[in-house]
Amino acid sequence: PWVYEQCQIHPGMRILELGCGDGVLWTQNISSLPGKVSVTLSDLSSGMLRDARRAIGRKDSRFSFEAFDCARIPHEDRSFDLVIANHVLFYCEDISAVCSEIQRVLTPGGKLICSTYGKKHMQEVSRLVRDFDDRIVLSADKLYERFGRENGADILAPYFSRIFWESYKDSLLVPDAEPLISYILSCHGNQNQYLLD
């Protein structure tokens, strides 16, 4: 709900979400979405779009679904009042091209809402794993170095005149080991090589 709340959606808005995944941003907030909006959900993966369409339902006329690369948005200039890139920009091969495209399709006064994380994200888990075996790396890619808390404003500055950072204040207490182990094993690093032997 936090990212959705930052969007401040009101009737009449034309919205584009880049990298919508399974549409969870919308399925979790569909009862709050005004009736007179137009939401274009996009993803590079047609499978993800299929999942989003299935989760939202085909009968909701507020939504359309399009597969495309966000470095080449197939819409006219000034088509959207709001563009959302929720944990997406750090996956983009050419972030500058994506920002240029977002700027192009936004209306004057339109907004980009994007999310990322920083260098200290989940640092306690990383430290725990390193203390167990210092060969383990939970992520082979440091995505925050591509677009993160520490450099995001500098990357966006050539394309957007006003940039604001809103921190999501949160903490997580994990009293049982099993969910933590499952999370660690699901990461994109080399942990399975050392932990599952």
For each of these PLM feature ranges, what is it?
Residues 113-135:
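Conserved class I S-adenosyl-L-methionine
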Residues 145-159:
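Short alpha-helix
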Residues 164-197:
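C-terminal helical/coil "lid" or tail adjacent to the Rossmann-like core of SAM-dependent
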Residues 82-95:
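A short SAM/SAH-binding and catalytic strip from SAM-dependent methyltransferases
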Residues 1-13, 28:
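Conserved alpha-helix/loop element of class I SAM-dependent methyltransferases that forms part
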Residues 16-72:
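Class I SAM-dependent methyltransferase SAM/SAH-binding core
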Residues 71-83:
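A short acidic, Gly/Pro-enriched loop at the edge of an enzyme's catalytic core
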